[in-house]
């Protein structure tokens, strides 16, 4: 039989297939090959009625995230708070390039809008992201229809209200929430093991644990691909390997001058590019010392 792993707990993998859930284990040959099944995996498995089954094969994954590990994700809701902590477009763009690089559709959700004296500044920023092609929403009513027919995970820095949002989406989850520490400006980690939960016509991961910004973008070409607006414009650059920094006849810099390109995003691109180049130089020095 074929199914999807929807929960992993204490060495057992719970596989959903044709409306039923089967408790399975992974055969020893997976350990020998260094393979581990993850929540989201499409698998072949064997199972008798009312007895423990076994995973026989794991299908290739289209994407993955770590800490906690989930695979084959359709979209990720990036939660950014309007206040406490303050909205940070640089941090948002770091989440977005991570998701773009992993071929996971991003949805931007702004929490704590009620703490603002005026929502206009956030809404103006939202229009910029919407012009790029991103879903940018500020209310639960806007978010819920986007969950249908999708496997969705939630991510964001500590304290933005991930657990609170998940509890509003699916109150049955009863996730523990952590209040912001005034002294640190950060929330307590209050996550638990991951599993999928059916709600609003889709599946959501019942952990708000994704706050890591680890990404393996190693060069300017990959970074360019992670910015949709740069990716579209780069086909018009004179040089195929254009980094949009110093090259002549660069379509990205031309769009910046005409106002077609949002300067904030270009500034973040340059910053991220510099970080990538610095990491590469550091790596070269380490290798040279060896």
Swiss-Prot record:
Its EC number is 3.6.1.-. Pfam families: RsgA_GTPase (PF03193), RsgA_N (PF16745). This is Small ribosomal subunit biogenesis GTPase RsgA. The keyword Nuclease does not apply. The keyword Secreted does not apply. GTP binds at residues 111-114, 156-164. Coiled coil: none annotated. Residues 62-213 form the CP-type G domain. CDD domains: S1_YloQ_GTPase, YjeQ_EngC. One of its GO terms (cellular component) is cytoplasm. InterPro entries: G_CP_dom (IPR030378), NA-bd_OB-fold (IPR012340), P-loop_NTPase (IPR027417), Ribosome_biogen_GTPase_RsgA (IPR004881), RsgA_GTPase_dom (IPR010914), RsgA_N (IPR031944). It is an enzyme of class 3 (hydrolase). One of its GO terms (molecular function) is metal ion binding. Its main location: cytoplasm. One of its GO terms (biological process) is ribosomal small subunit biogenesis. Its cofactor is Zn(2+). Belongs to the TRAFAC class YlqF/YawG GTPase family. RsgA subfamily. Zn(2+) binds at residues 237, 242, 244, 250. Gene3D superfamilies: Nucleic acid-binding proteins, P-loop containing nucleotide triphosphate hydrolases, Probable gtpase engc, domain 3. It comes from Streptococcus pyogenes serotype M3 (strain ATCC BAA-595 / MGAS315). Binds 1 zinc ion per subunit.
């Amino acid at each position: 039989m074929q199914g999807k792993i929807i929960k992993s707990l204490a060495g057992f993998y719970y596989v959903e297939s044709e409306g039923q859930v089967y408790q399975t284990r992974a055969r020893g040959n997976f350990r020998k090959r260094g393979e581990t099944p993850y929540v989201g995996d499409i698998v072949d498995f064997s199972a008798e009625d009312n007895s423990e089954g076994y995973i026989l094969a794991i299908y290739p994954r289209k994407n993955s995230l770590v800490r906690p590990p989930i695979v084959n994700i359709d979209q990720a809701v990036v939660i950014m708070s309007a206040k406490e902590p303050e909205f940070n477009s640089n941090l948002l763009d770091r989440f977005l390039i991570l998701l773009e690089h992993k071929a996971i559709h991003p949805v931007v959700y702004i929490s704590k809008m009620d703490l603002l004296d005026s929502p206009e500044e956030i809404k103006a920023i939202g229009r910029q992201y919407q012009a790029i092609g991103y879903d940018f929403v500020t209310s639960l009513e806007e978010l819920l229809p986007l969950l249908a027919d999708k496997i969705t995970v939630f991510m964001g820095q500590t304290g933005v209200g991930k657990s609170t949002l998940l509890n509003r989406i699916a109150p049955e989850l009863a996730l523990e929430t952590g209040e912001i520490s005034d002294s640190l400006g950060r929330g307590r980690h209050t996550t638990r093991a991951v599993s999928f939960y059916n709600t609003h016509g889709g599946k959501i991961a019942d952990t708000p644990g994704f706050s890591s910004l680890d990404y393996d973008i190693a060069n300017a070409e990959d970074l360019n691909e992670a910015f949709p607006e740069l990716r579209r414009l780069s086909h018009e650059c004179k040089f195929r390997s254009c980094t949009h920094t110093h090259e002549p006849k660069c379509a990205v810099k031309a769009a910046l001058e005409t106002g077609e390109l949002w300067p904030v995003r270009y500034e973040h691109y340059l910053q991220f590019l510099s970080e990538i180049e610095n990491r590469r130089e550091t790596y070269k020095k380490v290798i040279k010392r060896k």
